[in-house]
Amino acid sequence: MQNTLNVLINIKYSLKSLTLSLFLVFSVTSISEEYVPIPLDKLVCYGKGSQQQLSPSGEFLAAMVPVDENVCDIKDETDQEMMATDRVLVVTDLSTMKPKVLSGTTAGTSITSFRWLNDKKLLVSRDSRAGLDSASMYTIDRDGKNTTLLIKAKRFKNKPGFEVPSLYGVFPRFPDKVLISLFNSGSRSRDLYWLDINTKRTELVAREPSVPGEIVMNWLVDWEGVPRGFATFMEEGPNKGIETTFYKFTSDGYKKIHSCMHQQACFYPSYFDIDNKTVLGVGQAVLPNGKILNETDTNAMWSYDMDSGEYIEMIYHDPDYDLSSPMHGDYSLDMWFSPDGSELYGFSYQGAKTEKIYFDEYFATVNKSLEAAFPGNEVSVFDWSDDLTRFLFGVQSDKDPGSVYLFDISNGKTPVSRIASYAPWLSEYQLASTEPFTYMSRDGVKLHGYLTLPPTYKEGEKIPFIIHPHGGPNARDYWGYNPEVQFYATRGYGVIQMDYRGSTGYGRKEMMLANHEMGKSMQEDKYDALFWANEQGYVDMNNVCISGASYGGYAAMQAATKSPELFKCIIAYAVSYTHLRAHETSEN
């Protein structure tokens, strides 16, 4: 590994050259003599997404790519056939950079995902516009030969419904089989099976447990492919949809680990360590009796012994931000493991921007080298070869939804090459910058938000503003490209996005401060963000609007009645009127 580190040092000058090139490109874009706002269709035109994965050796790159050139071309979304046939699966030999189209799509059918099984063969999942009952899985060699159907969805003969296969996981220890789930549309259960890729035979691993009044959300599987536990949420009774329970399997069935309600402290087990005994998870160290060890308010990462039921240690804790919040639908924690699962390289989570924690020096060096080559952007390494010499990484920012690059350490001349860009046409225009900020509410609560100023903004200028609260309300905003915010900002408006109390990501206490406050302090938090921006000298207070969707739309409509003197216009869409009715009839 030290030799590879030396190679990294040797190519740092190439990365510096790349940084200079990018700087010159961005500089040319930013010094246009006459500002021309980006056309609306360019902002709302989403590029054709792509999935990429390196083969285990890193010698081949597989990708689902657009059939046509990735240009901004808004199509009729009712043309389902066109939507279903716009991507093909391509494998590129990285030594020659020659691509090979393995499989396209037929009318009404599309590839939904793929996975390298080894350097020669890929597993492909296919779907159909005709419905879930037409899904299938097959293997294909990297040269496009030996296409073999493994399993497909089937309708039941003697009862209504059908069974749909989907990939659950690939395990390095078992190269000849994969773990799949079979979804039963009648019972809504997902049973686990081994699928042999040579014989096509399936072997039952576990049937989904039937817990009265609860529905299984997911399995907890170890590195041997053995289910060790599962999580449910309440489907019936007064706690419907707001209570989660975690179980572990025992010799005679299963045993409850703990339950937690919405907003309560909760430990969410996520990944097994390679010892198949220790579980890594996020949340609070909650004991079966409800007591909390070393309460942290924000969700921390813990290691947990599945056999003894004891918490081993708190691995990492950020006092300001949750390391994701699975209980509230936030699965943003990204953990990086070695190819065989024996080592945790590190992880990332969402603070004001993406935060990264490293446990492996080499992996940290790779990431930091790439970050230095793309200043002002967020860099995320998401795939790598078994020998850690080739990496795929994404680059995105507040002005760009992202591109994918290949980093080849063995290529000292051109170590970094772009292989896909989500919306390349955006680089032709000047877009607005978004910056995180913090502010204090009128009752002394520290809150977070994002400020976006127009590309033409001049220091000291007071400009029209739009307050743009997110939906949810149990959600949050993130730093990155937002076409709606860019639409406002490129038309000359400043934009404020605020994570008012009740937002996720900032701990339980801040979330609970929103209880009984939907039309009260939650609403005032939005106005206080505006007042903060005004104190900084940005706002023309005679020209302020508020816009939002879902709960954000509710907040906009509340503003029309609660503080009409602040706003010149209200923009509300996809409004959750149940919020309005609930506020009229209840203090909850």
Per-region residue spans from a language model:
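Beta-propeller folds
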Residues: 32-390, 398-400
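Primarily recognizes the serine-hydrolase "nucleophile elbow" in alpha/beta-hydrolase
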Residues: 531-577
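Non-catalytic accessory segments flanking enzyme active sites
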Residues: 50, 216-220, 231, 346-347, ...
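Bacterial N-terminal signal peptides that target proteins for export
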Residues: 4-19
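Cap/lid segment of the alpha/beta-hydrolase catalytic domain
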Residues: 426-536, 540-542, 549
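Conserved small/polar residues in nucleotide/adenosyl-binding loops
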Residues: 578-585
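N-terminal signal peptide c-region/cleavage motif recognized by signal peptidases
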Residues: 27-28
